[in-house]
Amino acid sequence: MSEEALGELSGYIRERLGDAIEEANLAYGELTLCVPVASLIGVLTLLRDDVQCQFVNLTDISGVDYPQREKRFDVVYQLLSPRQNQRIRVKVQADEDTLVPSAVPVFFGAEWYEREAYDMYGILFSGHPDLRRILTDYGFEGHPLRKDFPLTGFVEVRYNDELKRVVYEPVQLRQEFRNFDFLSPWEGTDYVLPGDEKAKTN
């Protein structure tokens, strides 16, 4: 879609929604609307139902974590209008305690997307019919896509041959320190390493 057409769409949406749009950005051939949490459902409903918009397909909901911000999460909704051949992105900001209204009443397919955002980031959705984890295991601690989640996780899940079942154990780093040999003859060095049978001798 052309920049001009996206600019016209942005102007039309801002005219219809007024203060419900905090910011509209047009960059790289994509339109992004930033809206307050309280206006989210109204904005999504208008984008779906308005004849000029017809964004009837919710293709994704994702989270983005900015731990240095007061409202650390962006919740990003990707919408598609097959009739208009247009895509649009809607963003809201939330902190760990903010309840984002569930988009399930507007787009039924939002149910699993919101469960994934909850599971991976801990983003809370009010009015969701079944807000529970969807990807991680039962009893999983934390939310693995948050920037402050440890790379190793909190527990190690593995199959124990002796017990014939899956076991959960505290993470143990098998190799706390590793001494790398940076003086390798394969790196084009001119010196001979002790014990290197292939080293050149003068």
From Swiss-Prot:
Annotated Pfam families: Complex1_30kDa (PF00329)
Principal place of residence: membrane
SUPFAM superfamilies: Nqo5-like
Entry EC no(s): 7.1.1.-
One GO cellular component term noted in the UniProt record for this chain: plasma membrane
Taxonomy, superkingdom: Bacteria
Membrane topology qualifier: Peripheral membrane protein
Compartments it resides in: Cell inner membrane
Reactions accelerated catalytically: a quinone + NADH + 5 H(+)(in) = a quinol + NAD(+) + 4 H(+)(out)
Gene3D superfamilies to which the protein is assigned, alphabetical: NADH:ubiquinone oxidoreductase, 30kDa subunit (3.30.460.80)
Keywords associated with the record: Cell inner membrane, Cell membrane, Membrane, NAD, Quinone, Translocase, Transport, Ubiquinone
Single GO molecular function: NADH:ubiquinone reductase (non-electrogenic) activity
Signal sequence, start to end: none
Family to which this protein belongs: Belongs to the complex I 30 kDa subunit family.
Self-association state and partner proteins as the record states: NDH-1 is composed of 14 different subunits. Subunits NuoB, C, D, E, F, and G constitute the peripheral sector of the complex.
Biological role stated in the UniProt entry: NDH-1 shuttles electrons from NADH, via FMN and iron-sulfur (Fe-S) centers, to quinones in the respiratory chain. The immediate electron acceptor for the enzyme in this species is believed to be ubiquinone. Couples the redox reaction to proton translocation (for every two electrons transferred, four hydrogen ions are translocated across the cytoplasmic membrane), and thus conserves the redox energy in a proton gradient.
Descriptive protein name: NADH-quinone oxidoreductase subunit C
Organism of derivation: Brucella abortus (strain 2308)
Top-level taxonomy: Bacteria, Pseudomonadati, Pseudomonadota, Alphaproteobacteria, Hyphomicrobiales
